[in-house]
A protein has these predicted regions:
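Noncatalytic scaffold domains of N-terminal-nucleophile
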Residues: 1-28, 33-198, 203-205, 210-248, ...
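Active-site rim segments in enzyme catalytic domains, especially the processed small/beta chain
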Residues: 46-70, 222-225, 353-418, 442, ...
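Extended C-terminal regions of large enzymes
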Residues: 250-255, 410-427, 439
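Short beta-strand scaffold segments in enzyme catalytic cores
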Residues: 52-64, 343-348, 407-409, 499-507, ...
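Internal maturation/activation junctions in enzymes
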Residues: 271-361, 373-374, 381
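Short, small/polar residue-rich loop motifs at catalytic or cofactor-binding pockets
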Residues: 235, 339-342, 403-405
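A short acidic/small-residue loop/turn micro-motif
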Residues: 77, 362-364, 425
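Extended C-terminal subregions enriched in glycine
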Residues: 281, 304, 351, 399, ...
C-alpha cells in the first residue's frame, strides 16, 4: 500500500473497515465527526473485541476548524474496594481475573461527553440509537472473525479459558473461532440496546449500571455501584509542543502523551530531514529512551503529579536531552511498560472538525472477565498499579492508573491539520514519531509513511522482550548498522502486528482530506 485515499467531504480511518464504514455512514447523513466517531467506537467494540470494548477506557482529542483543541479523559479510577490490603500477600496485581478488573470502565462516558461537545459545536444531534445501530446489528447478526481475533483467542486460550464468562463468550464449541467464520455476541447486543434506549449515562447511573454492579459483586471485583455512579469523563487541558513545523497536541497524564511529544521535541533539535533509515531509527530510539525516563519518573494520576508536565516540553527542558544523544553509540536501556491492546481511529468532517480517538482494554481481552448477561469483557488497566505503597503508581481507591493511550493531532504552519495515532503499548509514541518524521520532515507520502517498515523499542502487543525490534523489510545494511551502534536488535516478520495499527488523516489547506490506514490491520480509510 503506497497511495492514500483522498476525499472532499469526509474521511474516517479505523483498523477495521466496518468501523470506518459506520463512521462514513454518519458523515453522509450530516452527522459531525464526533458523532461519526461514536458510531465507529461502538462498532469497533463489537468487530475487534479482543482489542477494545465497552469495558475499557477512551481518550479524545477534538480539533475544531479554529481555536484550541478539546481533550477528553474517559479513563476510570480504581474501585473503592481496591485497597492494598485487598491484595495482601501478593507481589503484584494479577493481569487476569476479577482482581485485575479493578478500575471503572470509562469509554462510554467519553462517548457521552463527546456528544455534548458535538451539540455545543453544531447545535444539532443525531439520536444515540442511530449511532449505535451498526454495532447492535453486528453483535446480533454476527461479525466476520478476523485472523487477529482468532490468533489472540488461540494464543491466550489456556491463560483465559477459566476466567469467568470467557469461554461462554469467546469460544465456539470450546475452541477459538476460525478466521472468516461468523461470530455472534447476543448479550452485548442486548447491552447496546439498553444504551440506545436508556442513554449512554445509564452505563453509570441506571438499570444497566445496577446490572453491572451486581455482576461485579458476584465475581468479587473491587468495583461497586457507587464507583460507577461517581465516575465522570473529564476535560483536561491537552499538552502542547511548539515544533518547527507547527503546533502539536497530545493528552496529559495519566497518559503517556508527554512521551510522544517529548520524542518529537527532542528530534526537532536534530537533523531528521536528511537522515537515512539507520540514523532515523537510532535518533528516534535514543529520544524514546529519554522520553521514557521522563514517563517513569513523573507520569501518574494527575492529582499526584510532582511536576507540571507541560514544563517538561519547554526548549530549556528538551535541549539537554537532545544534546545527550550520541550519533555513534546507543545508550543503556532498561525496560518498557508492556503491551496494550488498543484501537486508534480518526475522523474529519466537511466543516474541518477533526477527531483523534483511542479506546482500549489494555491486554488482549483485558482481564478476561465477562460480566454476566452483558457480553462486556472488563479491562485490566489496573494491573499498571504497584503494590508498593511508596511507588509512584501505588494502588489506592479512586486513583487513576498509568495509561499508554495517547491520540495525537497537529496544526502545521503550512495550513495542514493532521490527526494520527496507533495501538501498541510502548510502541504508540514511537510509531507516532516514525509517521510524523517520515511524512512531515522527510516528505514521504502519507500512506507510505505508515506502510514502510517500522521498529519498536520495548514491549507491545504479543511481545515480552525489551529489545529493539525491526520488521524484516529493513535493509540488511540498516540492521547491521544499528547493531554496530550497540542496539540489541531482534528482527520480526516483514509486516508484524507487534508494530501496532497506525492511521492518519490530513486536512489540506484546499479542503481535501487524505486518509491512510495500516496494512498490518483490517482497516480502511473511507471517504466521500
Amino acid at each position: 500500500m503506497h497511495s492514500s485515499n483522498v476525499s472532499t467531504h469526509g474521511m474516517a480511518v479505523a483498523p477495521h473497515h466496518l468501523a470506518s464504514q459506520s463512521a462514513l455512514a454518519i458523515l453522509r447523513e450530516g452527522g459531525s465527526a464526533i458523532e461519526a466517531m461514536v458510531a465507529a467506537a461502538a462498532a469497533i467494540a463489537v468487530v475487534y473485541p479482543h482489542m477494545n470494548g465497552l469495558g475499557g477506557d477512551g481518550f479524545w482529542l477534538i480539533v475544531p476548524p479554529e481555536g484550541d483543541p478539546i481533550a477528553i479523559d474517559a479513563s476510570g479510577a480504581a474501585g473503592s474496594l481496591a485497597t492494598l490490603e485487598a491484595y495482601a500477600g501478593q507481589q503484584h496485581i494479577p493481569h487476569r481475573g476479577p482482581q485485575a478488573a479493578l478500575t471503572v470502565a470509562g469509554t462510554v462516558s467519553g462517548w457521552d461527553e463527546a456528544l455534548r461537545i458535538s451539540r455545543d459545536l453544531t447545535g444539532r444531534a443525531l439520536p444515540v440509537a442511530r449511532l449505535l445501530a451498526d454495532a447492535i446489528g453486528y453483535a446480533e447478526d454476527g461479525i466476520p472473525v478476523t485472523a487477529s481475533q482468532a490468533h489472540a483467542t488461540a494464543s491466550k486460550l489456556e491463560e483465559l479459558r477459566h476466567q469467568p464468562g470467557f469461554s461462554e463468550t469467546w469460544l465456539v464449541s470450546g475452541e477459538a473461532p476460525r478466521p472468516g467464520s461468523r461470530f455472534r455476541q447476543p448479550a452485548l447486543a442486548g447491552t447496546l440496546r439498553m444504551l440506545a434506549s436508556d442513554g449512554l449515562d445509564s452505563f453509570y447511573r441506571g438499570p444497566l449500571a445496577e446490572r453491572l454492579a451486581q455482576g461485579m459483586a458476584a465475581l468479587g471485583m473491587p468495583i461497586t455501584l457507587g464507583d460507577l455512579q461517581a465516575h465522570r469523563a473529564r476535560r483536561p487541558a491537552p499538552l502542547t509542543l511548539q515544533h518547527q513545523q507547527g503546533t502539536l497536541w497530545n493528552l496529559a497524564p495519566p497518559t503517556q502523551g508527554l512521551v510522544s511529544l517529548a520524542i518529537l521535541g527532542i528530534t526537532d533539535r536534530l537533523n531528521m530531514a536528511d537522515a537515512d533509515d539507520a540514523q532515523t531509527v537510532h535518533r528516534i530510539v535514543e529520544a524514546t529512551k529519554r522520553a521514557f525516563a521522563l514517563r517513569d519518573a513523573h507520569i501518574t494520576d494527575p492529582r499526584h503529579l510532582d511536576v507540571d508536565a507541560q514544563q517538561l516540553l519547554t526548549p530549556e527542558a528538551l535541549q539537554p536531552l537532545a544534546d545527550s544523544i550520541d550519533d555513534a553509540s546507543a545508550s543503556p536501556w532498561g525496560r518498557g511498560k508492556g503491551p496494550g491492546d488498543t484501537v486508534w481511529m480518526g475522523v474529519v468532517d466537511n466543516s474541518g472538525l477533526a477527531v483523534s480517538f483511542i479506546q482500549s482494554i489494555y491486554h488482549e481481552f483485558g482481564s478476561g472477565v465477562v460480566l454476566p448477561d452483558t457480553g462486556i469483557v472488563w479491562q485490566n488497566r489496573g494491573a499498571a498499579f504497584s503494590l508498593d505503597p511508596q511507588h509512584l503508581l501505588a494502588l489506592a481507591p479512586g486513583k487513576q492508573p498509568f495509561h499508554t493511550l495517547n491520540p495525537a493531532a497537529a496544526r502545521l504552519n503550512d495550513g495542514r491539520v493532521m490527526v494520527y495515532g496507533s495501538m501498541g503499548g510502548d510502541g504508540q509514541p514511537q510509531t507516532q514519531a516514525a509517521l510524523f518524521t517520515r511524512y512531515i520532515l522527510q516528505g514521504v507520502p502519507l500512506q507510505e509513511s505508515i506502510s514502510r517498515p517500522r521498529w519498536l523499542l520495548g514491549r507491545t502487543w504479543g511481545q515480552s522482550s525489551d529489545s529493539l525490534k525491526l520488521e524484516g523489510r529493513f535493509a540488511p545494511a540498516c540492521i547491521a548498522r544499528l547493531r554496530e551502534l550497540g542496539h540489541e536488535v531482534e528482527v520480526l516478520a516483514d509486516f508484524s502486528e507487534a508494530m501496532g495499527h497506525a492511521g492518519a488523516i490530513v486536512r489540506h489547506p484546499n479542503g481535501l482530506l487524505e486518509g491512510a490506514t495500516d496494512p498490518r490491520s483490517n482497516g480502511a480509510a473511507a471517504g466521500y
